[in-house]
Amino acid sequence: MVTMSKQTCIELPVNPIVLGKLGSTYGIRGWLRVFSSTEHAEDIFAYQPWFIQRAGRWQHIELEAWKHHNQDMIIKIKGIDDLDAANSLTNCEIIVDSEQLPELDTGDYYWKDLIGCQVISTAGYNLGTVNDMMETGSNDVMVVKANLKDAFGVKERLIPFLDGQVIKKVDLATKTIEVDWDPGF
């Protein structure tokens, strides 16, 4: 538990998830750019409280204000009132408890749930493990780290997350994803 003041106690996230990142400073009064990983950028503000990790320690940050500025979103964090204080927060990841995230419709998945899944081709070949996810604009892409003894000598595969076309079955209980994908790619 992190104590912020005599009146306020904030519970640390039990199931932490990164929802964004603090960017460069804006102005001299402690404002920062914020980069959101949520589907709609502004949705990041619906998930509170926010935490960051600095020097291996959790720190609660309280949002004072936010606004659009040109193509960016900028935020003011309570207690961060000058350029030096804001600079100390640049590149920190914004973390919340994943329990706050809404339930998804059938066939929709959070990236956090796909990372770590084994990817198996429809022919039964183990293509590797989902190591990361990427957004390309047209569709999400799984970054699959191949097994050490991959028969095709591949170290990493980029497999588009196209439901029905490439993705045949996702089983989060067994952490497996069945794909129609050539192991040679």
From Swiss-Prot:
Q: Cite the PANTHER family for this sequence.
A: RIBOSOME MATURATION FACTOR RIMM
Query: Would you identify the family this protein belongs to, as annotated?
Result: Belongs to the RimM family.
Its protein name is Ribosome maturation factor RimM
GO MF annotation terms: ribosome binding
| Predominant cellular place of this UniProt entry's protein | cytoplasm
Q: Gene Ontology cellular component? A: cytoplasm; ribosome
Where in the numbering of this chain does the PRC barrel domain appear? 106-185
**Protein's job:** An accessory protein needed during the final step in the assembly of 30S ribosomal subunit, possibly for assembly of the head region. Essential for efficient processing of 16S rRNA. May be needed both before and after RbfA during the maturation of 16S rRNA. It has affinity for free ribosomal 30S subunits but not for 70S ribosomes.
Q: Sorted alphabetically, which InterPro entries does this protein's record hold? A: PRC-brl_dom (IPR027275), PRC_barrel-like_sf (IPR011033), RimM (IPR011961), RimM_N (IPR002676), RimM_N_sf (IPR036976), Transl_B-barrel_sf (IPR009000)
Taxonomy, top ranks, is:
Bacteria, Pseudomonadati, Pseudomonadota, Gammaproteobacteria, Enterobacterales
Free-text comment about domains: The PRC barrel domain binds ribosomal protein uS19.
BP GO terms, sorted = ribosomal small subunit biogenesis; rRNA processing
Give the record's keywords alphabetically.
Answer: Chaperone, Cytoplasm, Ribosome biogenesis, rRNA processing
Assembly notes: Binds ribosomal protein uS19.
Entry keyword Repeat: no
Q: Name one Pfam family in it.
A: PRC
Gene3D superfamilies (alphabetical): PRC-barrel domain, RimM
